Amino acid sequence: MTTAIVLDIEGTTSPTGAVREDLYGYTRARLPEWLARHRDDAAAPILAATRELAGRPDADTDEVARILREWLGSDVKAEPLKEAQGLICHEGFATGALHGEFFPDVPPALRAWHAAGHRLCVYSSGSLRNQRDWFAHARGGELGSLISAHFDLTTAGPKREAGSYRRIAEALGVEAGQLLFLSDHADELDAAVAAGWSAVGVHRPGEPNPPRPPHRWIGSFDELDLARTPVS
């Protein structure tokens, strides 16, 4: 019996374009000014970590901004970039400049699954702060109260490694066989299954990642009949 459902975001609950155009675009436009404004407080560890990772110990804030923008454009999963993006976008969510965008079937499905007793969690490459803001500031009504746990690359590990899913199961205190993972990435589904989870692929029109065997694939959360099975 499935007791917990773990959700990917990009391509699964939300359009990839919305995540990258909204969050990435907002971050890219504000990086230089934000780094300069917060160089002595919130940005200080980000500046230091970026200089170390890039091998540029003497880089000024403008050069660090260029490095972070290059990483953003290449979708590099670097911790200082994720931290900067989380802090910058948090300001955007707080002011109403940003909202979480979801496929139309997602909010009602999440509410139904939650009402039926399923525990809902998120596992994404986005920072924990961005994840929470994305759901809390969902367009059309907040969804954050439905989510009981968030995991990212720092707290769980790489999404294509089985060990990451074992760590999530341990953190949740749930047996692997009671966990269901929903993602649009076949390699991530492979890793979840290798860790003993159930996994279902989500392939939506216009999304870039193709489905492949041996996984079951759906085009909408409506195709999962989990809400009819209350969890004891």
Curated annotation (Swiss-Prot):
Pathway: Amino-acid biosynthesis; L-methionine biosynthesis via salvage pathway; L-methionine from S-methyl-5-thio-alpha-D-ribose 1-phosphate: step 3/6; Amino-acid biosynthesis; L-methionine biosynthesis via salvage pathway; L-methionine from S-methyl-5-thio-alpha-D-ribose 1-phosphate: step 4/6. One of its GO terms (biological process) is L-methionine salvage from methylthioadenosine. GO terms for molecular function: 2,3-diketo-5-methylthiopentyl-1-phosphate enolase activity; 2-hydroxy-3-keto-5-methylthiopentenyl-1-phosphate phosphatase activity; acireductone synthase activity; magnesium ion binding. Its EC number is 3.1.3.77. Belongs to the HAD-like hydrolase superfamily. MasA/MtnC family. Monomer. Bifunctional enzyme that catalyzes the enolization of 2,3-diketo-5-methylthiopentyl-1-phosphate (DK-MTP-1-P) into the intermediate 2-hydroxy-3-keto-5-methylthiopentenyl-1-phosphate (HK-MTPenyl-1-P), which is then dephosphorylated to form the acireductone 1,2-dihydroxy-3-keto-5-methylthiopentene (DHK-MTPene). PANTHER family: ENOLASE-PHOSPHATASE E1. This is Enolase-phosphatase E1.
